[in-house]
Amino acid sequence: MNLWQQNYDPAGNIWLSSLIASLPILFFFFALIKLKLKGYVAASWTVAIALAVALLFYKMPVANALASVVYGFFYGLWPIAWIIIAAVFVYKISVKTGQFDIIRSSILSITPDQRLQMLIVGFCFGAFLEGAAGFGAPVAITAALLVGLGFKPLYAAGLCLIVNTAPVAFGAMGIPILVAGQVTGIDSFEIGQMVGRQLPFMTIIVLFWIMAIMDGWRGIKETWPAVVVAGGSFAIAQYLSSNFIGPELPDIISSLVSLLCLTLFLKRWQPVRVFRFGDLGASQVDMTLAHTGYTAGQVLRAWTPFLFLTATVTLWSIPPFKALFASGGALYEWVINIPVPYLDKLVARMPPVVSEATAYAAVFKFDWFSATGTAILFAALLSIVWLKMKPSDAISTFGSTLKELALPIYSIGMVLAFAFISNYSGLSSTLALALAHTGHAFTFFSPFLGWLGVFLTGSDTSSNALFAALQATAAQQIGVSDLLLVAANTTGGVTGKMISPQSIAIACAAVGLVGKESDLFRFTVKHSLIFTCIVGVITTLQAYVLTWMIP
């Protein structure tokens, strides 16, 4: 087949081209906010519209377009859906074996206040999981835990998506930062330093914001000491670790520091009023559980599924383990790489999105052993043995997990199909170039490019792979630091995670809100836009006023 070259301005006017390119995204927003369609229906129609735009407007060859849709769908199944299946399975094992009541009791013994439980589980534990695994696992696990603690499913999912803003940039052992360095040629350590000079401000803001969502101004007044301890310790550790150690460990270090500081603080301090969602009966049951006397051994045993999960995910994430499966590694043959027919290196990305015409690779990687989902499955198997769960119960639990997740898995597949057709057709790059045409105001809009990338792909890593080079080019054109705008792509990207269709589908799957994706999207969308504007203001100030903050 011939090499097809992307054309980012088919209409001959970048604004008109970007308007047509935005049709699938505008439809997706409209479908969830106004039409209130189920997630899988909205995603299916969005793929159809994106495919039509790619074929009719961008003149993408039919074979290339269909191949990108199929590639995206399978990428949604592996590795993304695999992570969700394994994570929900671990949670169900904990519930089925009766251990979750003990976990709930142990958290209630630290604090019965659900605002503070949100800080412990949603923020601290979620940030740790983001640092170790990323790619949807933290929201799935923490949202399920919070539902078990008595949170309403919509609130658990929505709050976890919003609070996940703080750690995403350094997620999965710093992969978003490392990828930004690879595609721009800028030292990834310096990018990490710059992100570490933007995100700590957002961390504090996000935690106060969460308290306001949960309990209004009263919530802020009653919990501010705990928020300052949790957010302040996290922000300081995030700044120090990113600026003096590197981009791989800020989430791991910051989350552990924050968890330790918050737990010790809550032994000395509790809010004057205990805040609980839901009815009085449920609260009374929880308070009874809080006073149930479990031994330290029982509590430790109950937490073992999540301790196993933490251990296996961390092991799978460390560089020596990853190196085994990399090219030239001892176990490289265990990774099955399948070049996608009719797509691999048959589409060329063109300047100014890249410095020179570059063939776009499309290789499906089936890393059956080294995938994060497999690490979580190992934790599940260890838990089954350790908790002496009957094999028949374990099999039926896994079966019910698959049955429950069938529709969400289809949704995730369609969402990734949309992301891939957007990328391979050049649709996403058209939107990026339109933003880059805003001149000196681009410092404000720069984070929106990262936001758009994460909305489209569900991943800060993928957003950086798509747009970091364009950010660097635009920065040079308007005379500001390329390091700053590449970092802004990463920092802005984290604010798009909470409305990314992939994240919405994952969160709904984890808390049993299948078909309610529109409710969750409406819950998070305004917060996402406000946070992106805040990052835009921070970036603009750093570009023109606080230039001393740039490394």
From Swiss-Prot:
Reaction(s) the record says it catalyses:
(S)-lactate(in) + H(+)(in) = (S)-lactate(out) + H(+)(out); (R)-lactate(in) + H(+)(in) = (R)-lactate(out) + H(+)(out); glycolate(in) + H(+)(in) = glycolate(out) + H(+)(out)
Entry's transmembrane regions: 13-33, 37-57, 69-89, 131-151, 159-179, 194-214, 220-240, 244-264, 366-386, 405-425, 438-458, 494-514, 530-550
The answer to whether the entry has keyword Manganese is no
Q: Which domain of life is it from?
A: Bacteria
Recount the UniProt induction comment for this entry. Answer: By L-lactate; aerobically.
Subcellular localization: Cell inner membrane
Q: Name one GO biological process term.
A: DNA damage response
Quote the cellular component terms of the Gene Ontology held in the record.
plasma membrane
Q: Which UniProt keywords apply?
A: Cell inner membrane, Cell membrane, Membrane, Symport, Transmembrane, Transmembrane helix, Transport
Q: How is its activity regulated?
A: Inhibited by the proton ionophore carbonyl cyanide m-chlorophenylhydrazone (CCCP).
Free-text disruption phenotype from the record: The glcA-lldP double mutant is unable to grow on glycolate and displays undetectable glycolate uptake when grown in the presence of glycolate.
Its membrane topology, per UniProt?
Answer: Multi-pass membrane protein
In the record, what terms sit under GO molecular function? glycolate transmembrane transporter activity; lactate transmembrane transporter activity; solute:proton symporter activity
Biological role stated in the UniProt entry: Uptake of L-lactate across the membrane. Can also transport D-lactate and glycolate. Seems to be driven by a proton motive force.
Family the UniProt entry places it in: Belongs to the lactate permease family.
Protein known as? L-lactate permease
From which source organism is this entry? Answer: Escherichia coli (strain K12)
